[in-house]
């Protein structure tokens, strides 16, 4: 369990003001110039040593990602913060944007300095109107105080941070589709290589990071890499914001140590499963794009490696709890409709496959399929998985794979009951 003094996001639930004065009282912008004076290599190495892995879902080493940026270039390079949070079941970045905007802005400054970027863009989901307003107010405060802009914090480093609002497309959460949108084009993923670190925004080297990944950086640098690395488990260090929703007594967002038990997380912070743990049916542990886990696997540790071993993934940390009253087949069919709607249509397997899967899933809800079609559906998900430019095809396939893997008997019972009728 995370100690109170180890929490990074002390205003996660908005009990205090999010303005600059209150943020400074909570420790934001404390000796930021001293951190910048330590140099770029120090910041990158410290983040590497901390073991911080991307909090947007991929789990790639943040410090390693920064080190890929070319050095001593004459042309511009950019930092882009992905605040296009659109994953069903996920609302962690939204609370950071609402209640801890200065943590994010200070993190943007430090990360921009570390990679040599004088310009940073925060790409925020279009529907996040109030959150965008809070960020813009915080940016205005930071500019007025000289914390960002020309000679940021008196360090001699110039850093401009811009807020860019998206238009509600889930696909723009994919880093290269986000760059396309930022350039004023249709948000469609790019082929890789070239990777953004070599050819990103406007053809310049670019690093794209998640909101939470950037917001924890100032605290890591102040308290030290060893402090952050001492929380959680080896290779899964630090704290993480988990979003707990669905059939629990008290849905909430909570910051906890990586590696905490899923059961402990739900019972300690969300008041337990509605009707008790025995009433649990399944949990989606990391946002809608990861396979669900049946009750028998729901005492797993919440970290990248443990969940991968269990056949799922940590993803965004969006925990969706489903009790015995859930029509699990319909729940996954509803997710299939989401991915069909959000496919950009660029890749044939995703464009055609997501629609086909949704249509079969809706027949499956009624039981109006043959048993052989279960395997046919599974084969189609595997044909889509890994055969698209971005991971949306995988995200559409994995929930269905998890359903068939763990609830095949329920699907077959549905088919049998339909045939009897």
From Swiss-Prot:
Gene3D superfamilies: 3.10.20.600, NADH-ubiquinone oxidoreductase 51kDa subunit, NADH-ubiquinone oxidoreductase 51kDa subunit, iron-sulphur binding domain
MF GO annotations: 4 iron, 4 sulfur cluster binding; FMN binding; metal ion binding; NAD binding; NADH dehydrogenase (ubiquinone) activity; quinone binding
Family under the similarity heading: Belongs to the complex I 51 kDa subunit family.
Positions that bind FMN: 166-213
Organism the protein comes from: Rickettsia rickettsii (strain Sheila Smith)
Phylogenetic classification of the source organism: Bacteria, Pseudomonadati, Pseudomonadota, Alphaproteobacteria, Rickettsiales
Binding site for NAD(+): 54-63
SMART domains listed in its UniProt record: NADH_4Fe-4S
Record's miscellaneous remark: Belongs to an operon consisting of at least secF-nuoF-lepB-rnc.
Protein's UniProt name: NADH-quinone oxidoreductase subunit F
Needed co-factor(s): FMN; [4Fe-4S] cluster
UniProt EC number: 7.1.1.-
Keywords of the record: 4Fe-4S, Flavoprotein, FMN, Iron, Iron-sulfur, Metal-binding, NAD, Quinone, Translocase
Protein role: NDH-1 shuttles electrons from NADH, via FMN and iron-sulfur (Fe-S) centers, to quinones in the respiratory chain. Couples the redox reaction to proton translocation (for every two electrons transferred, four hydrogen ions are translocated across the cytoplasmic membrane), and thus conserves the redox energy in a proton gradient.
Pfam families attached to this UniProt entry: Complex1_51K, NADH_4Fe-4S, SLBB_2
Annotated catalysed reactions: a quinone + NADH + 5 H(+)(in) = a quinol + NAD(+) + 4 H(+)(out)
Broad enzyme group: translocase
Chain residues that bind [4Fe-4S] cluster: 344, 347, 350, 390
Cofactor note: Binds 1 FMN.
């Amino acid at each position: 369990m995370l100690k109170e003094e180890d929490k990074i996001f002390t205003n996660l639930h908005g009990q205090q003001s999010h303005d600059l004065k209150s943020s400074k009282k909570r420790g934001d912008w404390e000796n930021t110039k001293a951190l910048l004076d330590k140099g770029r290599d120090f910041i990158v190495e410290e983040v590497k040593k901390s073991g911080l892995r991307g909090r947007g879902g991929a789990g790639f080493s943040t410090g390693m990602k920064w080190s890929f940026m070319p050095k001593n270039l004459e042309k511009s390079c950019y930092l882009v913060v992905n605040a296009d949070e659109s994953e069903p079941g996920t609302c962690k970045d939204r609370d950071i944007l609402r209640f801890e905007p200065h943590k994010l802005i200070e993190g943007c400054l430090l990360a921009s300095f570390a990679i040599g970027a004088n310009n940073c863009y925060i790409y925020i989901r279009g529907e996040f109107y109030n959150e965008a307003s809070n960020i813009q107010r915080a940016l205005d405060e930071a500019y007025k105080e000289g914390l960002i802009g020309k000679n940021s914090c008196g360090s001699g480093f110039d850093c401009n941070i811009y807020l860019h609002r998206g238009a509600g497309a889930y696909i723009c959460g994919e880093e290269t589709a986000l760059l396309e949108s930022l350039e004023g084009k249709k948000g469609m993923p790019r082929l890789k290589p070239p990777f953004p670190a070599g050819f990103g925004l406007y053809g310049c080297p670019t690093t794209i990071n998640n909101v939470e990944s950037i917001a924890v950086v100032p605290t890591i640098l102040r308290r030290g890499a060893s402090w952050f690395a001492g929380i959680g488990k080896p290779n899964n260090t630090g704290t993480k914001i988990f979003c707990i929703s669905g059939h629990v007594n008290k849905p909430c967002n909570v910051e906890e140590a990586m590696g905490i038990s899923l059961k402990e997380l739900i019972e300690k912070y969300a008041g337990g499963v509605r009707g008790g743990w025995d009433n649990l049916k399944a949990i989606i542990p990391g946002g809608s794009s990861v396979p669900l886990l049946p009750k028998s696997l729901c005492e797993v540790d919440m970290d990248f490696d443990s969940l991968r071993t269990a056949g799922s993934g940590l993803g965004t940390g969006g925990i969706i709890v489903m009790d015995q009253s859930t029509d699990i087949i319909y729940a996954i069919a509803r997710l299939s409709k989401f991915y069909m709607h959000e496919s950009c249509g660029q890749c044939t397997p995703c464009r055609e496959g997501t629609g086909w899967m949704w249509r079969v899933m809706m027949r499956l809800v009624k039981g109006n399929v043959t048993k052989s079609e279960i395997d046919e559906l599974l084969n189609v998900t595997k044909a889509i998985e890994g055969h698209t430019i971005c991971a949306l095809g995988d995200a559409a396939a994995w929930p269905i794979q998890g359903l068939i893997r763990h609830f095949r008997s329920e699907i077959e019972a549905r088919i049998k009951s339909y045939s009897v009728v």
